[in-house]
Amino acid sequence: PTHATSDMNMAEDRIGPERIRGAYAWQRFRAQGTVIAAGSDFPVESPNPFFGLHAAITRQGHDDQPDGGWYPTQRLTAEQALRAFTLDAAFAAHQEKSLGTLEPGKWADFILVDRDIFAIAPQEIWRTQVLETWVGGVRVFAR
């Protein structure tokens, strides 16, 4: 999703006013039954997943621009965005039986963060910090 907010200043000039309406059109895709799988787009974009969640939910840069978001009807909800980065990304990689959710029999890869992204202002999500990282049920990082 960060590529949308990175591209918003030049995308319409490059692909035109007609085609831009179908670009980055996440809610339109969802309405047609498309699974939206999200990732960081690293190395072109930051690997920080909270930058991507912020972009998907607000469709704004870190400066809160543009007002209301770029093509705001295409914003994802926080729940939709988190699913795109977890279960739907695992589905896209044909790994949904072992990744994407915390369930018995799955790998138990997860992070603990310093805030509840569902309880804060969407414009603050990109500031989220990881406190712990767990891989296969083992803590591998602690702040």
Where are these regions (language model features)?
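His/Asp/Glu-enriched, well-ordered alpha-helical/loop segment
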Residues: P1-A119, Q123, T128, E132-G136
